[in-house]
Amino acid sequence: MSKQTFTTTFAGKPLVVEVGQVAKQANGATVVRYGDSTVLTAAVMSKKMATGDFFPLQVNYEEKMYAAGKFPGGFMKREGRPSTDATLTARLIDRPIRPMFAEGFRNEVQVINTVLSYDENASAPMAAMFGSSLALSISDIPFNGPIAGVQVGYIDGEFIINPDKEQMEASLLELTVAGSKEAINMVESGAKELSEDIMLEALLKGHQAIQELIAFQEQIVAVVGKEKAEVELLQVDVDLQADIVAKYNAQLQKAVQVEEKKAREAATEAVKEMVKAEYEERYAEDENLATIMRDVAEILEQMEHAEVRRLITEDKIRPDGRKIDEIRPLDAVVDFLPKVHGSGLFTRGQTQALSVLTLAPMGETQIIDGLAPEYKKRFLHHYNFPQYSVGETGRYGAAGRREIGHGALGERALEQVLPSLEEFPYAIRLVAEVLESNGSSSQASICAGTLALMAGGVPIKAPVAGIAMGLISDGTNYTVLTDIQGLEDHFGDMDFKVAGTREGITALQMDIKIAGITPQILEEALAQAKKARFEILDVIEATIAEPRPELAPTAPKIDTIKIDVDKIKVVIGKGGETIDKIIAETGVKIDIDDEGNVSIYSSDQAAIDRTKEIIAGLVREAKVGEVYHAKVVRIEKFGAFVNLFDKTDALVHISEIAWTRTTNVSDVLEVGEDVDVKVIKIDEKGRVDASMKALIPRPPKPEKKEEKHD
């Protein structure tokens, strides 16, 4: 296929799609140019069904530093592992695409997005999401799209689609919404305490804008789209299924209704193992034993899936016996750990998170050097999910995509209520350790983070709580669940996380397993989430009503002084020599910004006070009219040089030593002698003239003798 180009305008910027020129051996490939951002997307599919009980979809978002005209950092000067932003963007694209593949599809699919040029005012992630959907849609991969996504901002009561950098900085909302022509299927948002009504309207505005992008994709697919390949879907033997359901459905139904998680898992596992043992023995000699046992496992999964959903939708019974809108038992604790700067332990049923606060000088902020201009990140929220939290063994190592994503969600939820840098000049790190998990651990980490911040004396604007909402839908009827647990998440259709204060929402995240959800479901879920959020905030505020007025004794104290900008180099010294000497002497940490604000950090107040004295001395300037107790440091024929303070000397001219005539300076003064002087002049070069005689009363003039007249 020769190169074909398709052009439109979206949100005030040109959107150009090129097909047929590059990456032609992929199943589908596009080059998307949005503004001056250019993204190459290639989609490929394996020829055979993969083994395993899940759909092996991999979405990558690769940031090439040349796209922004930069050299990669590090010794190797080559792109390494994806940045956090790249990982989050890959997840952002994966989530709306994944539900658009058929149930039982098991061929491996890879969607690789490479940013070739970067324009900070034209969203490369949104171009990559568009390109991912289009590459799949024009390929022979059986993708039931297209989908598209947009960013939505909110400024002065107006919604803005795909805001530029300046607009986003002024926006009260940073929302990414994706979906198909029919419905929304992915949401990711941070917001400055906006109401449910505003958030819902933003979602609908975003979905409305998506229609334009989907129509553009459909236009392109009609011209260059390939016929979809026939692939084998994972389907179980219907006779085998009927046999197992008839024999064991009642036993599995009973096991599913055991309320306690571990007991329920043991009961369901016992039924499954009994079934597997029977059929493994029955078909031991069959050459298709592996396929049969795969089908047995899949049938049992489907039976459990169906029973959980039936109980909720028909009987209105949840696996643990709760009502549809009931939250699990809550518990909140502060000061769980000694010595640290703040800690909070939050428990919701069998989900438990410990959050630990660390405060540090601003010099500890994280420097982010990606495609965007380098910036410093003051607040970090890290989320760890060890396998012991679910009673299992597993991989330990660097944080995976899920942990990075959950940490980022908590970060967005909490950063909206943090004090400004002027109010609280600290770098802030929260680490959430998930100690138990039975669903909604990311929301537990937000609640624990609120406890740790308030316990640590961080003056947040308001406490934040999070809740996860679920959905069971049969296409006609649906049930919205409050505070979903693991089983409801696994077998449900939606995981909709809502975090916020009593004033409004600070973060949203939604993932679904069906094609999309309606505005009515969104509205109902937001309303139930608000009620639940207030219940959780009641528990948090009963534990600690407001941030403590003081920091923990172990936290670094801070004092700030202001110096003239032209004195910054004096405090730092050549090659940092002066500031390093101060730090070595006092043991403090010092940050100096470009405006001359000097922040001094230490757990020892005496060390802070001593540092302030040293810096004040370094930046001190002589002033005309002020008197100084000085020391003679050099004598010349024309006068004496005296040291006023630190590195500031002044000249006392020979005529300014005394009111009487001084013939020889050394007859009056000697090096090392202490004298009081008054500054009488500072010239344009900063040279200081001082006087000793100005401090001595001027002797009266001798009376003139009267002349005698004869």
From Swiss-Prot:
MF term (GO), any: magnesium ion binding
Chain positions covered by the region annotation Disordered: 691-710
Reaction catalysis annotation: RNA(n+1) + phosphate = RNA(n) + a ribonucleoside 5'-diphosphate
GO CC list: cytosol
Residue ranges occupied by any KH domain in the UniProt entry: 556-615
Cofactors, names only: Mg(2+)
Described purpose of this protein according to its UniProt entry: Involved in mRNA degradation. Catalyzes the phosphorolysis of single-stranded polyribonucleotides processively in the 3'- to 5'-direction.
Family, similarity comment: Belongs to the polyribonucleotide nucleotidyltransferase family.
Protein name: Polyribonucleotide nucleotidyltransferase
Annotated source species: Streptococcus pyogenes serotype M1
